[in-house]
Amino acid sequence: MDPLANIKNEINLMNHRISSFATYVNYQLLEFKQSMSNIELMLQENIESKKKTKTDTEPNSPTKPLSTSIPTTTTAATSQSITSTSLSSSSSLSNQIAQPPIINGQVLNSSILTPTSRKKLSLVDIDKNNYNNYNNNNNNNNNNNNNNNNNNNNNNNNNNNNNNNVTTTDKKEGEKNENENENENENENENENENDIIEEDKIIEKMDEELENEQVEPVEQVKPKTQGGRKKVSKLTLDFGIGKRPVRTKTLTQLGIALEKEDTPKKRQRK
């Protein structure tokens, strides 16, 4: 079976259960309304009986004034109106209860919903009465789905047969076209590779020409300046990598370099 058919069947089952639960709730509400109407009737009968007893005892009591006596016509009229309304409501309720609900286009058994039976309606009762019909409908649907699947399989087989009946000329033409496309792609790749090689050769030639045209300037060798003649060189010297040159103390003091002076004996002061 198709998964869609299973999903549809599950949806139908859920709808059936929901509808059955709704009928159960409606029936319970109708029973509640009927019980309330019966209670109202009982209360009205009690009130009327009390009123009758009062009217019977009123003429015997001499102390009660006449102005306080309630006329019986109004009570009778009100009681008749109340009873008529209650009867009409009860009759309407009985008519509503007598009409069985319809689920999935099928009428439920009226014996369950009759007020005389006083049988409590449950989901089990509804399922018992309607589950067979529901199963029959599901079986019919499943049979229809199976028939549709068989038809689809037949159509698929026919399509496969039609596909198998493709002529050999079409296959050969397809193979020729594929071979031609492969050859064209190979030729294009070869041409692209040749063009790339030619461009690289041109670039290399240009670079060689530029290197040849460039003139290398000779580097002048800078000779260190030498002092001419012999001069006394002080002991304090600095090495700058070129040679030892005499350095005056003033420049060193200006640079902030600490000098280590030799311990010279102090001159003797004359007395």
From Swiss-Prot:
Residues 61-93, 129-165 have a biased composition (Low complexity). Residues 169-179 have a biased composition (Basic and acidic residues). Residues 50-93, 128-233 are annotated as: Disordered. Transmembrane segments: none annotated. Residues 180-199, 207-217 have a biased composition (Acidic residues). Coiled coil: none annotated. This is Putative uncharacterized protein DDB_G0292438.
